[in-house]
Amino acid sequence: MKSVRYLIGLFTFIACYYLLPISTRLLWQPDETRYAEISREMLASGDWIVPHLLGLRYFEKPIAGYWINSIGQWLFGANNFGVRAGVIFATLLTAALVTWFTLRLWRNKRLALLATVIYLSLFIVYAIGTYAVLDPFIAFWLVAGMCSFWLAMQAQTWKGKSAGFLLLGITCGMGVMTKGFLALAVPVLSVLPWVATQKRWKDLFIYGWLAVISCVLTVLPWGLAIAQREPDFWHYFFWVEHIQRFALDDAQHRAPFWYYLPVIIAGSLPWLGLLPGALYAGWKNRKHSATVYLLSWTIMPLLFFSVAKGKLPTYILSCFAPLAMLMAHYALLAAKNNPLALRINGWINIAFGVTGIIATFVVSPWGPMNTPVWQTFESYKVFCAWSIFSLWAFFGWYTLTNVEKTWPFAALCPLGLALLVGFSIPDRVMEGKHPQFFVEMTQESLQPSRYILTDSVGVAAGLAWSLQRDDIIMYRQTGELKYGLNYPDAKGRFVSGDEFANWLNQHRQEGIITLVLSVDRDEDINSLAIPPADVIDRQERLVLIQYRPK
């Protein structure tokens, strides 16, 4: 009976966090709009080999993540939930692997359930796991690969070991097809310390080639297909997207070595109080094979990405699966022996909630700021933000009422965030970061446009997805579409600022021409170097400028 209650509680938890509130949040640009539009175009064109964005070749990532996203939109429609369905599914599958692996290590159902709940409620997991990017997919394949390797190394027969390594190769292959060759480097680095300390080199060398073969066979069909269709794909993807992105001096998203320290601290909420103890307990019990495996799995990818020049918070998502298991194991021991860390965790959550309440007041219309984040007419959004932090503080307090028993309720600290964040985004943010909001405000003007031009790839993708058209033209800036625009068949998909007046004269009689520009808040749109327009509609950071046939 208790198991049934636990399952009902888990499914209710998942529904409140990962299902019910998702449609209330508009898509963010540039990431969510980009991946939404790539998958929409894949479904519309039926081309499941070559990824396209705005009808242009888009070689920044391989294909597998787009497949899953496309299936999500195919099943649930071209809506906010459909766009995010793939990442939510991947996150829940990863949580299922956390459950299975914890059971495999400790044979404790309560511990497995707690590890799962901790994982799903970690701030970084929830933030990325409900956000339409490719990182939850690669995190799933990496976690699946680590589970497969453990399964192989614990097997007692050659059949079991062979099956485990074959499965490892498949997960690595799918990882390569999702985000590239990092799916090979990260698992290898993660297992090496464990293999070395356990002296398991023999099994690795005897059976490792099976993983290599299954990985190659997994990638080969699509790899050959895209090489035949687009011979330049692999050169661009390997050199630009791997070497330049991570290693060279001009790497994308450059950041210092310590970049991930605040990411781990913030990402560990609402379980931050368990982080030091979980890592220390893991190190203290390093003679235990499973603990060494989890520690290595957590730390090695973190060190790898810290050394790399290019960094983003999403890169270390897979590290939080083993960390959640270590936290759950440590929390049960602490509840039984010394609940100090659990009390500290409760106070951290109270402090975070109270700080959020104060910060919300400071940036509200009634605070001391001359330019508040919310305007007076957005009062309900301020109250939503207050509710988010009030619930966080409340559940932090509740965990302290009987800490040995109530500490798991820290998982409910982000409940207000999950349910209300979509209702608390300020209009000034929505107008620049949510193209859907702009489209809703200007739908009647946009719909009949013969040509639409914009200077932002993220906005272009949002317009294309919302309007169900992939012929948006880039104006002045090419951004990440620069490579695709270099192909001969992309001629006419970019108009420079100097060419715009002539281009306008040539095409004006064909129908309404709409220009959507991103501007600074204090920028005078009358000073823009463009021909006089028939219509100008400014929505804070985005401006609709329209030219009608003469």
From Swiss-Prot:
GO terms for molecular function: 4-amino-4-deoxy-L-arabinose transferase activity; mannosyltransferase activity. One of its GO terms (biological process) is protein O-linked glycosylation. The keyword Protein biosynthesis does not apply. It holds the Pfam family PMT. It is an enzyme of class 2 (transferase). GO terms for cellular component: plasma membrane. InterPro entries: ArnT_tfrase, Glyco_trans_39/83, LipidA_mod_glycosyltrf_83. It comes from the Bacteria. The chain crosses the membrane at residues 7-27, 81-101, 111-133, 137-154, 165-185, 204-224, 263-283, 288-308, 315-335, 346-366, 382-402, 406-426. Its EC number is 2.4.2.43. Pathway: Lipopolysaccharide metabolism; 4-amino-4-deoxy-beta-L-arabinose-lipid A biosynthesis. Keywords: Cell inner membrane, Cell membrane, Glycosyltransferase, Lipid A biosynthesis, Lipid biosynthesis, Lipid metabolism, Lipopolysaccharide biosynthesis, Membrane, Transferase, Transmembrane, Transmembrane helix. It is a multi-pass membrane protein. It catalyses: 4-amino-4-deoxy-alpha-L-arabinopyranosyl di-trans,octa-cis-undecaprenyl phosphate + lipid IVA = lipid IIA + di-trans,octa-cis-undecaprenyl phosphate. It is found in: Cell inner membrane. The keyword Lipid biosynthesis applies. Its main location: membrane. Belongs to the glycosyltransferase 83 family. Catalyzes the transfer of the L-Ara4N moiety of the glycolipid undecaprenyl phosphate-alpha-L-Ara4N to lipid A. The modified arabinose is attached to lipid A and is required for resistance to polymyxin and cationic antimicrobial peptides. This is Undecaprenyl phosphate-alpha-4-amino-4-deoxy-L-arabinose arabinosyl transferase. It comes from Escherichia coli O45:K1 (strain S88 / ExPEC). The lineage of its organism: Bacteria, Pseudomonadati, Pseudomonadota, Gammaproteobacteria, Enterobacterales.
